[in-house]
Every structure is written in structure tokens, then in C-alpha cells.
Amino acid sequence: MSKYEFIKIEKKWQEFWDNNKTYKVKEDPNIPKEKRLYILDMFPYPSANGLHVGHPEGYTATDIFGRYKLLNGFHVLHPIGFDSFGLPAENYAIQTGTHPQKSTEENINKFKKQIKALGFAYDWDREIRTHDENYYKWTQWIFLELYKKGLAYAKEMPVWYCPELGTVLANEEIIQTPDGPKSERGFHNVEKKYLRQWVLKITKYAERLLNDLEELEWPESVKEMQRNWIGKSTGVEIDFEIEGHNDKIKVFTTRPDTIFGITYLVIAPESKLIEKITKNNFKRNVLKYVKHEELKSDLKRTSLEKDKSGVFTGSYAFHPITNEKIPIWIGSYVLGTYGSGAVMGVPAHDERDFQFAKKYKLKILPVISKSGKNEILEKAFIDDGISINSPNEFNNLKNSEVKDKVIEWLIKNKKGKEKVTYKLRDWIFSRQRYWGEPIPILFDKLGNAVPLEKNDLPLKLPKTANYKPSRTGESPLSRIKDWVNLKDTGFTRETNTMPQWAGSCWYYLRYLDPKNPKEFASKKKIEYWMPVDLYIGGAEHTVLHLLYSRFWHKVLYDLGYVNTKEPFKKLINQGIITAFSYQKENGILIPNDQVIEKNSKFFDKRDNKEVIQVIAKMSKSLKNVINPDDIIKEFGADSIRIYEMFMGPLTDSKPWNTKGIIGVFRFLNKIWNLREKELSKDNPPKEIISQLHKAIKKVTEDTEKLSFNTAISAMMIFVNELIKYEKNYLNIFKPFIIILSPYAPHLAEELWEYIGETPSLFKNSKWPEFDENLIIKDAKEIVLQINGKMKDKILLSKETDEEELKEIAMGNSKIKANLLNKKIVKIIAIKNKLVNIVIK
């Protein structure tokens, strides 16, 4: 029996695909739009750690689907590249003392080698790298288009600054934790700092970003997260005049029906009104309070669980309808970045207001109740009800009616207006780091911004050995004086760089025309391929990359450069591949190499105390990262591909278990060993024909809907039937090789060549069709016995009569093996049940 030499086989076919450019795709105008397919992976950033087994999951899914569609006559575009600018690459360079240009190139080469070893059908001629000047030239150009459209501006503003990373971070890059705000990258402490920043007006597109979600085939959870992040609120903006001042406090509310329950106003600690309106004898306390609150995170300030704090300004506003005086407070739970940075305190009908009023002994006035009568409140009443304690024309009405009447009164008397607000903030687009796209802006002697011309692009990132970030907020580029100052012109360059998200905002478009020096992509090619039909990647990019790229795409659509309103038609989030880890009694996870197994129990080597096995994310610190290179060496790329898809539904998280891949490896060996049987052109038995069509049907339907695990299961069941036959029937084996090929392309190519066909299978075959009429319906399991002892089980149609049962049993390989040199006394066949052969 010849050994399944997977290493040799996989190397052979990877070289064949490379040398023959098997997966290179060109635009063919004769192929109709409905037969074109653009499949995309979220491209990787090339970290020094290389791939772990979690990374190939999404890539394998797109590869299987792309190959399947290719075999079904589709013109498939499936490109790959590298998101190579940004913090991860720069941090690695700083840690190792290697320039990011050098380390990034080295890491890309490592990634490419690993990706190619998995046998993915990428068109490598379309490879892109976001740090390549021929790529970022167009990132800079798109920025200038945003600038010309008035969507990019510079301003001094409070921003999240991370001293450890040495840069400003966008709101989306901050994680709010009970211990304060942290950077998403590295989980470092961050602080608020006033710096001049470039900002993109993503808020101008808030409504369209929200509404167009309805057109997308995306997971509902992702759409809901984007809706919440955009945070649309419809309500009314009310003007409150301030006693002794010309200024007004503008308050946005979605509950104008509670306006008569206002007993105080609260403004944010960041409000510029504080200095103007605070009475002298209150200033000391106010300034102390404001300084203290600046250090807190938004989450901590607004959390219902946290104690509400505030301070009185000594000033009053007037109620817009009753003209009553209302005290003006400063409160921690009001954010300057949301709405107008002020709220009306209605403690009877808002829980935060209720807590605040209780703490500072402020009046609580209910104006809505369930019964229409005054009731004692233990907490804020937030339900619908009947209005009470309100002026006559607003009293004793449903609160929905009060809402309409209040809005009408405010508009009529010019005390307010209907308004829509969003939680979404403009995108802070500059970073004080070296390894990023230089922003193509000059400043004249007066500080006015002057955009570069298209002919001046790319503005190249200057080479420097001193690329480490400062801890003061200045960019490393500011230290390169001969680059910053344009000789004899009086102009200086912008020294901030773009964030790591810039290059990924539009990369799917550059794949369409990656070597075009005149434009980011020709309109003809954009119209040929767009939109992306299937996009697979992690859910962690929901409010970062996915939102940003939608924004840029809509701008390009408005400018007439792209033909679709949305970039990604269908999105799938693959689940996380986790790993086993070990947890001590106190909940602390310990590295896997500190654990020993005794009698199916696990113990910490250091103290010999029992630990429990748990599922955790793969991490270097826990020593539970699985390197795909090791798995490929031991079991092969086809094994890892099939195992990752067989572990469970694509969208589920599931733990890696190397023991599980052994079963997949056995499955591939079973297929390989079919070569040992006679390859027969005889007509196959109808039972195996039926089983084949059943398998084709299942694999076709499940691959189409990305249910890869059940498609693999169907192939495993079929192979178990196939190996029962003495011969390997060509008319059965050939179509099976084709349905196997998207999942195990190397093995399939080798078997395709073995049966005498011309490689590549992916260019010289088509997906087999199934015939419903040939699929056994209402099948029954038939037990095959010799002298009453079971030797095998087979599935047969309920219509199979006794004589056919006998004939099939006598042709069964396991039965035949047991009948050698034996005398058959009689054969007993019972329809839909068994065949028993009596021998002596």
C-alpha cells in the first residue's frame, strides 16, 4: 500500500499553481454580471508572530466557496494583500530595534510563505501592501478628495492620548473599562489632551450609514452594533435663558413630555459656559471639581452603577414655558461630546437624574403617573402615563399628547426646534507616529493649510533611524527638519501621519487594478467587479474598519468614482478558534506548559494543586497558541483546512483540539488508499450511484450556504460506503474527486491526475449535478449476517425485494471475504431488515 505523502503532494501542486498562474483572473466582458464573483478576506497585518491556526479559518472558508463557484462556471476574483502600515508593525520594530520598513517586509515574506503553504487560490498578481508608496499615493489622494469636499479639517480638540503608544487614538480605538479607559491596542492607560488634529466628518454621513444598513446581507448583530454606535435620537432642542447672561443653554431631549418636571439643569464639566456663568463664591469648588472629572472615562461618568457627582455653579436658568428659576449644576454624567453637553434634570422620570437629585437633596417633581394621581416614588417612573402637576392646557393628558403639544408650543414661541442627534463623533484621523501615510498638507507662514497637488503624490515617508514616538504628543516626523521645512518657500509639512485604518478603507478597490499608475482603479474595472459579493472577517472590526470603509466608499460614490453605494454586499463573521487552557481555583489562568495530566485530571506543576481545563483565547502568555506550520508538517494542509471547517458551523467559536485533526487525517488516508483498488470503467452498482448523488446533493447545498461542516460529514459518510466495494468505479470516483476538491485541493489534484485527467482540475472540470431520481428515498438499514453474526450494515431502498437483497449481500466485499472456502447452506433474506447467510 503506497503511503499518503502529503508533504510531497502539496508542494508539487502549490508549485504547479504558482508556475501556471492557475488562479489568475482577467476581466472578460463576455461573462455576464451574474456569473462574476468578488470574494474577499479581511487582509492581515503582518505581525512577527506569523499565523496561528485561528487565522486560516476565514481564509479557508472563502477559498472553499471560491473554488466551488469556479467549478460552477463563475468568474471568481479572490485577491490577498497586507495591511502593513500602523501601530502593530511599528511597535514590533521598536521592541526589536529593527526599522519598520525592514521588519515589515520580513514579516510579509513569512506570512506569504505560510499562506501559500495552505494552498489558497489567491491571484497573487493582485497583491497589495498598504505601506508601498504606489499604494499609499492613492490613500493620500483620497484624503485630498475628502479635504476638497470639506470633509477633512484640522482643529485643536480634547483627544484620547496614550503615552505608552505615544499617539492620539480615535474614540473607536478606546475600550471603556471599570478601571478607566484603555487603548484597544495593548490595553494601556489613556488620558485626555488638547492637540491639533485632523478630523474627518463622518457625521455628515450618519443618516446614510444608518439607513443603508437595511440593504446589506450582514449579521444582524453587526448591523445593530453599527446602529448603536451611530446612535440616532429624534427629539427637540430647547433654549434655556440664563439669568444675568445673554448666553443660552441648549438642551436636546427625546422626552419633551417631562419638561414640567425639570427641577435643575446639568452641564458637562467640559462646557465652555462654566467660566462665564459660575458665581465668584462658587468658582473654587467648581474648578477643583472640573479638574477631577477630566481624568475620568466616559463609561465611569455615565454608568448607572457609579455614584453621580456634581457641583452647583450658583447660577440659574429660566424654564422656557413657566419662566420658573432652575438651578444650573455641573454633573459627571453629562458628556460634552454628546448632544449639546447639557441635560434637563427631571429626577422623577430619569434614573440618573433621580440618583443625582437624591444625593444633593434637589426637588423631585413627578409630572407623569400611571393613575393620573400623585404617587410616592421609590425610583424614577419611566413608563407612559397621564400628565400631572403641569399647567392646565398640558394637564391630565396622555404623555404622548403632552409631547406633541410641548413641541408645538416651543416651536411657535421660538423656544425650541425639532432636532435629530447622533452619538457618532467625527473621526480623529491623525496619529503622532512614524509608520503611517504622511498627510499631504503644507502650512504657509500664517498657518493656513495648503493641499498638495496630485502630481506631487506620493508624499513619501522619509527615512530616519529616529522613529520612536515622543511622550509629549509630537510626531517623530517633526524631528526631521529638512523634510518638514520646504527650503526658501516658507512652507512647512504636516508632521502627523494617518491612522492604521486609512489604507484598509479602500483596499478592496485597489485589488481591481493594482498596477494602475494613473488612478486608484479604472472605472471600467470597478463597474465590472463591484460590489464585493462575500466578505469574511472578524466581528471585532464592526465599528472601526467596516464603518470607516463604508464612509469612504460613500464619499467616492458621491464624487462619481465608484458605482455602488455600499462596498460589501454580504458579510460573514467567522467564529474564534479558541484553545484549551487551565484555571486555578482563584480563577487565574496559567500557561499550558505548567500543567501535567494524571489519571485524566490536570495539576499545576509548581504546587501540585488540581486545575480545571477551560476554553480560552489563544495567547502567547498562556502558551496555547497552535502554529499551523507544525500541523502542516505532521498532517498536511488539506487536513488543517478540512479540520477547521469540520469543527463546527463557520460562525461559531470552537476550541482547537489536535486530537480531532487525527480523524480528518484518517479520512484523507481512506480516500488516498482507494488508489489501491482496481480503477474500473464497469457500470457501478445502483446503490453506490445513489449514495454518490446523495453526497453531491448534500455537499452542493451545504457548500452554497457555507455549511462546510455538514458537507464534510456527508463526504465522510460517502467514503465509508465507497470503501466497501472491491473496485474503485471511475464513474463514481471522478465526480467525488471534484466535490472533494474545494476542501482538499492538493489531494484532489493528485487523484485527478491519477485517473488520467489533465491538471488543473480547477480549469478542466465542472461541478457534478445530482439526479433526485437516483437518490434512494426512505432508505432502510439492512444488516448483513453470516451464521447470525453481523458483518456489515448497508442502506438500501425500502423497495428492494428479497432476491435483490441476496444479490447485493453476495457482492458485498466483507461478506465475500468471509465466504472463502466455505459452503453456503442457505440464504435468508427479510425485506427491509436483514440478510443472513448460513454456512458450514
UniProtKB/Swiss-Prot annotation:
Residues given in the record as ATP binding sites: 620
Sequence motif: 'KMSKS' region, positions: 617-621
Keywords: Aminoacyl-tRNA synthetase, ATP-binding, Cytoplasm, Ligase, Nucleotide-binding, Protein biosynthesis
EC number from the UniProt entry: 6.1.1.4
Catalytic reactions on record: tRNA(Leu) + L-leucine + ATP = L-leucyl-tRNA(Leu) + AMP + diphosphate
Motif, 'HIGH' region: chain positions: 44-55
Localization (cell): Cytoplasm
A GO molecular function held by the record: ATP binding
Main location: cytoplasm
Pfam families in the record: Anticodon_1, tRNA-synt_1, tRNA-synt_1_2, tRNA-synt_1g
InterPro entries reported for this sequence: aa-tRNA-synth_I_CS, aa-tRNA-synth_Ia, Leu-tRNA-ligase, Leu_tRNA-synth_edit, M/V/L/I-tRNA-synth_anticd-bd, Methionyl/Leucyl_tRNA_Synth, Rossmann-like_a/b/a_fold, tRNAsynth_Ia_anticodon-bd
Protein's UniProt keywords contain Protein biosynthesis: yes
UniProt GO BP: leucyl-tRNA aminoacylation
GO cellular component, one term: cytosol
Record-linked CDD domains: Anticodon_Ia_Leu_BEm (cd07958), LeuRS_core (cd00812)
Family note: Belongs to the class-I aminoacyl-tRNA synthetase family.
HAMAP family: Leu_tRNA_synth_B (MF_00049_B)
Official protein name in the record: Leucine--tRNA ligase
Gene that this sequence comes from: leuS
